[in-house]
Design a protein with these regions (language model features):
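Helix-loop-beta segment of a Rossmann-like dinucleotide-binding subdomain
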Residues: 74-96, 129-131, 218-232
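Predominantly flavin-linked oxidoreductase catalytic cores and closely associated redox partners
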Residues: 110-255
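N-terminal Rossmann-like FAD-binding beta1-loop-alpha1 element of flavoenzymes
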Residues: 2-30
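Conserved Rossmann-like nucleotide-cofactor binding loop
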Residues: 13, 36, 157
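FAD/FMN-dependent oxidoreductases across multiple families
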Residues: 83, 207, 229-311
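Long, low-complexity C-terminal extensions of enzymes
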Residues: 306, 310-427
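Short beta-strand to alpha-helix junction loop
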Residues: 85-107, 153, 231-240
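N-terminal FAD cofactor-binding segment of flavoenzymes
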Residues: 20-73
């Protein structure tokens, strides 16, 4: 059967879009370097309200109602009010990776997705169709597959999709451990989104780029603790993060007893949007869909895959002779409409600011941000608020922020001005 859409990749983005396209009756093939059934190594977290709105709460392995962050100055005195947590009042969950993968795999298989193992190498467009040359996993030769449209879902280092070069890309870096500890590293039953306390560091170290602890109780004596740098170019090295994690724990009298799994996390936070007039479409990390202010992606994949698949299916049916460029065009418009592009520009502008903030500024900023009404900070973090709603939230943040944060928000440095202009000019 001729292929309508060839999806490249076998991560969450590839499976999500392949399932949605195939369920709309399209002939879909997935070309992946690895077996799509190979277990994923990343842990994926999501807010409870976000997963509930998608009706997918059953895909979670863990969830927490006791969710908080620490933005105080972090003296070691527990009686110090600066040590009290900011309570988020919203549930947070971790996906069961196997169940999430299975959820998409089963839908792909039921809808007849064809699996091809190989490394995509070259893309060309002839007679209005797309041809992909790939190195098959089980043969020495190069093979060719033709499709009406190619969707590049090969992750952040995308194989085909092109984007403008706009300078250094900031990476979110983290080093984490799932394991057992000599004492609970967080309160039993607790999820900590960001612990910015830094009293385990010297004054000189506190001048270096700040990092925070992301941590959770997994039950039965197991915890996940991860030292994280929100975003930096070049990224904070793993060795620094590991050392900071160990020192943070030691400062609280906690040592790692048994390592079950180590997580090395690095992905780009502010990739420029791809060119929206190219004849190949993209989805997921390849399409710069990671939220530039939080690093989250999975919720966006689940929300946006049906919208994109519907647009592609409609374009294919509307014009059975449509060329790849035309189909990709319909897809890009659905994936990155002006409203989402404006929001992306706004988040990128915000991230640029945060990357310049000192440790006290960051703590004060986040403390103010999470004091906003819950709908406002949640709408910002999950990308469900409209542009006007985001602007209202940001104005409120500015009005209620302390002076050190106001000063940081007002001063324009580096490429902030260009990003701000981009925000105004996005159409
Ligand atoms: C450690 C870590 C933790 C994260 N935690 C979260 C989280 O909690 N919540 C969240 O929402 N996001 C999280 N993210 C961010 C984001 O969700 C992930 O990076 C996500 O895996 C990106 O999905 P993707 O499908 O776009 O790309 P990937 O998962 O990177 O998948 C790319 C796929 O393409 C294949 N491929 C690549 N090149 C080729 C080629 N030439 N030919 C054929 N196949 C190819 C690869 O083999 C792979 O199967 C995390 C990221 C990391 C690294």
């Amino acid at each position: 059967m001729p292929t309508d859409v060839l999806v490249v990749g076998a991560g969450p983005a590839a499976l999500a879009i392949a399932a949605e396209l195939a369920e709309r009756g399209l002939a879909v093939a997935v070309l992946a370097a690895t077996d799509p059934r190979d277990p994923w190594s990343n842990t994926y977290g999501i807010w409870g309200d976000e997963v509930d709105a998608l009706g997918l709460g059953h895909l979670l392995e863990h969830s927490w109602s006791d969710t908080c962050s620490y933005f105080g100055s972090g003296s070691s005195d527990p009686a110090d009010p600066a040590n009290s947590p900011t309570r988020h009042g919203r549930d947070y969950g971790l996906f069961d990776k196997t169940r999430l993968q299975q959820f998409w795999l089963e839908r792909c298989e039921a809808a007849g997705v064809q699996w091809i193992r190989g490394l995509a190498e070259e893309l060309s467009h002839g007679s209005g169709r797309s041809q992909v040359r790939y190195a098959p996993a089980l043969a020495a030769d190069v093979a060719l597959i033709e499709a009406r449209l190619v969707v590049d879902a090969s992750g952040h280092k995308a194989v085909f999709v092109q984007r403008p070069e706009l300078g250094p890309v900031a990476g979110q870096a983290a080093y984490g451990v799932v394991g057992r500890f000599t004492a609970p590293p967080v309160q039993p039953g607790q999820f900590v989104l960001m612990d910015y306390r830094a009293d385990h560091l010297s004054e000189a170290e506190r001048q270096e780029p700040p990092t925070f602890l992301y941590a959770m109780d997994l039950g039965q004596g197991r915890f996940f603790v991860e030292e994280t740098s929100l975003a930096l170019a070049p990224p904070v090295p793993y060795a620094t993060l590991k050392q900071r994690l160990e020192r943070r724990l030691a400062h609280r009298g906690v040592a790692i007893e048994q390592v079950e799994h180590e997580e090395f996390c690095l992905f780009p936070m502010n990739l420029p949007l791809p060119d929206l007039d190219q004849p190949v479409l993209a989805f997921g990390g390849a399409a710069a869909m990671v939220h530039p202010a939080s690093g989250y992606l999975v919720g966006a994949l689940l929300r946006r895959a049906p919208v994109l698949a519907a647009a592609v299916a409609q374009a294919l049916r509307a014009n059975p002779a449509a060329a790849s460029a035309e189909l990709a065009q319909a897809g890009w418009q659905a994936l990155w409409p002006p409203e989402l592009r404006r929001k992306h520009a706004l988040y990128q502008f915000g991230l640029e600011k945060l990357m310049r903030f000192s440790e006290p500024q960051l703590r004060a900023h986040f403390s103010t941000f999470f004091s906003l009404p819950k709908e406002q900070w949640y709408g910002f973090l999950v990308n469900t608020a409209s542009v006007p709603e985001l602007i209202v939230a940001m104005l409120r943040l500015f009005a209620t922020a302390p002076w050190n944060v106001k000063a940081g928000l007002m001063g324009m440095q580096g490429r902030e001005l260009a990003l701000g202009m981009g925000l105004i000019l996005t159409r």
